[in-house]
Amino acid sequence: MAESIGLIERAAALLRQLDANESAPLPPPAGEAGAGHGGPELVLDRGRLASYGITIPSSARSRTVEEFRLVKRNLMTQFSPGDSSTDQRSSRLIMVTSARPGEGKTFISLNLALAFASERDVKALLVDVDTQHSTLQTILGISTEQGIVDVLAGNCELSEVLIQTNILNFMVLPSGRGGPHVPELFSSNKMANLMAEMTRRFADRYIIIDTPPCMASSDAAALAPQRCSR
């Protein structure tokens, strides 16, 4: 319970920081360049992340760092990357949502993904599926307009939109542009196949999914039943 309260406090702090930064946005990250995996590469500004209350693998030990280490360790004792069984692959898909907007789900998603990325033997893939209000893209400074929605719509390949960052073991799949039929895309067989592909292709990763609030959008309900079935 104490861990949960602490995380909620940090989430509230993030929201205050986002509000404060709306009139004076921080400068964007240093830049992007082509990466060997075929998609873009994003150079994250560590100072920018810290200003939003986001911890990075090289952060000094602090209350926030230790809280996310505890959550991460609990998850890792239950689900191990590299296990080829269907149940274990699907269990490494960790969906983070909230009841309403503004409750800190992106704060949790990003910090948890970076906590996994600090491990020596595993990696993290952070997937943004909040197409309506992507706080994640604001924090990371992602400018690309393509993402998972475009993959599902058949407009591009997964490898074209996966973003490799300058933080070791940490990749991002942005949301892409929203639209009236996003819930149908998320509930489709193509989404189930994409999740299965990601868990097979990235067997050494925990896949954190930053999901829209469940009481503000039908997207979360569409995504919840999607499990790795192949």
What are the functions of these language-model segments?
Residues 1-230:
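P-loop NTP-binding module
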